[in-house]
């Protein structure tokens, strides 16, 4: 059975400012760096062997800090990037017009092929993160990879493994530097394929990120 750990990046400046990030970027806050260090300590105890990270700056930095603690090599995979939020990226959530908020709601509420102008749909996101996850099955026997990605991307992945629609990720609270675990099992009795063992564990952290206190 293959165990895969999923980690959301540490808190960023735009998380604290409640700005839409998507595939745009902002640096980790001091809190975010500390969160990543705490994940690193946990990753070392979990026996992580590989770190596979989104190639965006906030995930790269989170992965680098984790790697320093557990001594793993890092590879980058653009398929683990956050949902492309198109023209709304860099905007403060509270500044959206009624029309812009309508675009966002269509996307997260499951409207068929809903997307923000210039962005991607939840189905497109689901397809690419599942392709990235499938690549883990090609790792050597005994591997225990840790994937560093983003809130919507990881929520979409966990939701769809559970058999829920991609937009159900809004019902999952995956805080900054939370750890989830999924397993790949082959069984004639239990469900074969990917199963969710845990989601959104923050027992290794001190406190939630600023943007999540307001949800």
UniProtKB/Swiss-Prot annotation:
Pfam families xrefs: His_Phos_1
SUPFAM superfamilies: Phosphoglycerate mutase-like
Site (Transition state stabilizer): 150
Reaction(s) the record says it catalyses: (2R)-2-phosphoglycerate = (2R)-3-phosphoglycerate
Recorded superkingdom: Bacteria
Pathway in which this enzyme or protein is active: Carbohydrate degradation; glycolysis; pyruvate from D-glyceraldehyde 3-phosphate: step 3/5
Protein name, as recorded: Probable phosphoglycerate mutase GpmB
Species of the source: Salmonella paratyphi C (strain RKS4594)
Designated gene of the protein: gpmB
